[in-house]
From Swiss-Prot:
This is Cilia- and flagella-associated protein 299. GO terms for cellular component: cytoplasm; nucleus. Its main location: cytoplasm. Keywords: Cytoplasm, Nucleus. The gene is cfap299. It is found in: Cytoplasm; Nucleus. The keyword Hydrolase does not apply. InterPro entries: DUF4464 (IPR027887). It holds the Pfam family DUF4464. May be involved in spermatogenesis.
Amino acid sequence: MEQSEAGSAADSIITQFNTYEDFLDSQITALDLHYLEDEELARQLVELGYRGSGEVLKRDEFEARKAAAEASRLSQRTQQKTLSSAGKDPKDNFLKALAMREEANRNGKMTSVIFIRDKNAHGQEVSGYIDFAHRLKTEDFEVYFSGKKKLLPRPTDLSFYNWESHVSTSNPSPNYQVIAETSSGLLFKNKRDRKILNVDPKASPGDNSTRTSIQTDIYIQAVIYDHITRRKS
């Protein structure tokens, strides 16, 4: 109990004072300076425990605790910065919708599939289904949330189609298996809970899944399918 209280007192000290000298100075009274006539000597006496009415804390312990506190602060800051949408103020509904889903897709609680139909840099109409969680892990989304770059489907995504060249591809991802050419059209099987995600707009998206059509000014069409992942027991 005493050890815990001492630790709490030390933590309070390193929070309150920026340097060890500041802490020592706080323990020195005007009377000490009057009799000793030497600030450095007064500091040494406080450090040795001969002066001061508060907690005696050695320099190395103060500096070690200070370093640990700074490391903890930087770690928390880094964790906060892992969200690519952090600090961004997207104006378009599509980017706002992605920002709302980013954290859940990063921590595995949700695996969203994004459908995009738009024109590429060559003016060709393309469409495709993107595993949002996978793309978040494999590229920097800050350029999308800041508006510097436009998110578009690629031939390496879950599904891709170029309406002009008629190039069509489909690929599994770490989260989904592609089940193509069924009577129900294109289906995706979640690899974690093995639930089927149906992207047919006329059908139900499936268990633990929702379909959200986004009103957007930057794409011809955008739809987000959210699947709440539940590991199969």
